[in-house]
Amino acid sequence: MPLPYKSIIYRPSAGKAKITRGLFDLLAGCLLIFMMLGTREAGISGDEEVHYQQSVKVYNFYATGGADKSVLDTPYSQLKYYGQSFDNITTILIRWFNIDDIYTFRHQMNALAGWLCILLAALLAVWLSGYGAGILTLLLFAVSPTFLGHAQNNLKDIPFALAYLAGTLFLLRWLFAKQRTWKNTLPLILSIAFCISIRPGGLLLLCYLLLFTAILEFKTYRETAKINIGLLKNRAYSLGLIVLGSYLLGILLWPYVLLNPISGFLKSYQVMAQFPTTIRQIFEGRLEWSDLLPWYYLPKLMLITIPLIVWTGVLSFFALTGKAFRQDGLKYGFLIFTILFPIVFVLYEHSNLYGSWRHFLFVYPAIVVLAAIGLYQLLQRFSEPFTRFGIVLLLLMLAYDPFTFLVRNHPYDYLYYNQLTGGLKGAYGNYETDYYYHSIREGSEWLIADLKKNHPGDSLKIGTNFPAEWFFRKEKNLAVTYFPYSDRSQYDWDYCIVANSYISPTLLKNKIWPPKNSVKIIEADGIPICAVVKRESKADFLGYRAFQQHHPEESVKYYEELVKKECQDELIFFNFASVCYSMGDREKTISLLQKGLEINPNCEPILMFQANILAEKGDLSKAASLYETVIGLNRKYFDAYPALARICLVQKETKKARELLKSCLTMDPGFKEAIVLMADSYRTSDPEVARKYDELAKQTK
């Protein structure tokens, strides 16, 4: 019996073999089962907790008739500018049906959204090129680790991919329909509304609607040389209805925009286009800020993480579909535009991007459709059995790598890198691995089981580099604290769970991480992605606390005890050096800083400390070199800019000093020390400019 979606999406011709339709249905059903079962081991993704908390606020806003406006108070997360309707709908269901296992249900809902996205992509391929292309679309998704990995727990980007793909599909069908009726207009309105309701970028679909309609009307005019005023009025009425209807429906579950229907949406788009939160991540072997990455960050990450079989299909599409382009050029042209335009736009805008290309998962379904059509055309082009067998064998070889990665490394599917980087092992230390913290779940569950076995009932403090309270919610004797891994010596903890996320590539490549006191290491393809660390001594924390409480002599005792042992934490040496420096022991300070650099030669605080000591001694040349090193490692280490600029001013390099300060103020316009020094640089040469900077400094906190 054919699935019910067929009557909605397409009408299969009588000539299509039942066995082909049956295979399509079977593959789609198997994918659904696989994806739903795959959520059982899914971790909580990096942004999931904060989005869930925001969805609870959205629920409370509507449950109180708008009286509870805490949903609008998001100074850090900025989530009031984010529609996140899928999160909101999921939380509504959680509340209505009193679901206790919140995150499991969220992951199941997300897997369903991911499967629907795959299904619609396959149906789009069927509409464009037949069942063969549709089946290949399903198969390509089955070996797409990045998409399948995010389909486990990414309730931001997977639902948006579903909405964007649905909007694209229904828009194309509406544009090329013989008659535009409610039957093809309503799905278009609903899909655009769904896309807008998730994030402001959904507005793209309305832009496509207007642009593609204008192109078709212009094409009709060129062919007929006539303008039908009545028809144009009807088209304008239909467009207005679609735009208004989809927009109004799209903001129903978005409190901020619902209260400010025009200005709220414009502000949301502005914030999301240049998202203010920036993070450091590994790219090409070095840590770099997300808003300072090279322009090719996005295309390169897509190139090295999308399976080569998909890229082979894309190349085949452009090489072999000339006839299809001649017959359906506009359809394919519009589809390709929906892929390329968002990518080109963010490259042009130099938008703030991080977390690999997960924010652009929404273009992947259309890429897979083109790849599937390309592979289908490749198989059709070469009908000779031996040649076709060779092609199939080649495709199976290309599919082998991503497929076996999925089998070996589930639930860490999204960590996949293709053969261009040498796989995950080749990417290790050069690109981020578990950037969405999926492995924290396995680490937490292992530690809970181990403590119940070996330390039942003990009150212990657990540290993590990602909020993990949910996994420990039933363990009343275990207190969980979040802190960055690099700051671990400054916190009180007994065990620490650390995902391989945003850790210095120097520590990774030199095998300083995972540390030697790890009691459990979780791996994917032979590389560590999470470590459970047991603290051997709290002398580092006690020494730090003593110094903070102004007891340097006591602090020294703790640190002396610690550094006698093998130590892999460079910050301990930095903190110990700070104590010695405060006590006037410069020689020991320098010695400790050097030992810290033996662990991590690129430790910015230590290099900065060394530079300050050299500047204090008057060795300005060496100090300047170290300041430049710090800036080279971290372009947002703002304290280094005025420090280096002062040396430049002393050495009469005023132009260089001002360039440094301008660079600093471009990234942080409110950095007062740089403003004051800029004023000083003009104090003699241009008192009026100096006065303006002085005024700016007074206005800056």
What are these regions (language model features)?
Residues 237-274, 303, 397-413:
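Membrane-lumen/periplasm interface segments of specific transmembrane helices
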Residues 3, 424-701:
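C-terminal luminal/periplasmic domains and tails of membrane-associated envelope-modifying transferases
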Residues 25-26, 121-143, 162, 180-183, ...:
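Transmembrane-helix signature of polytopic, membrane-embedded enzymes
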Residues 137-142, 149, 169, 192, ...:
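Short helix- or helix-capping micro-motifs
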Residues 300-328, 483:
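Hydrophobic, aromatic-rich transmembrane alpha-helices
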Residues 108-128, 166, 170:
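Transmembrane-helix motifs of polytopic, lipid-linked glycan transferases
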Residues 5-7, 170-184, 192, 205-247, ...:
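Perimembrane helix-loop-helix junctions
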Residues 25-29, 190, 207-211, 239-244, ...:
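Signature aromatic-anchored transmembrane alpha helix within multi-pass, membrane-resident enzymes
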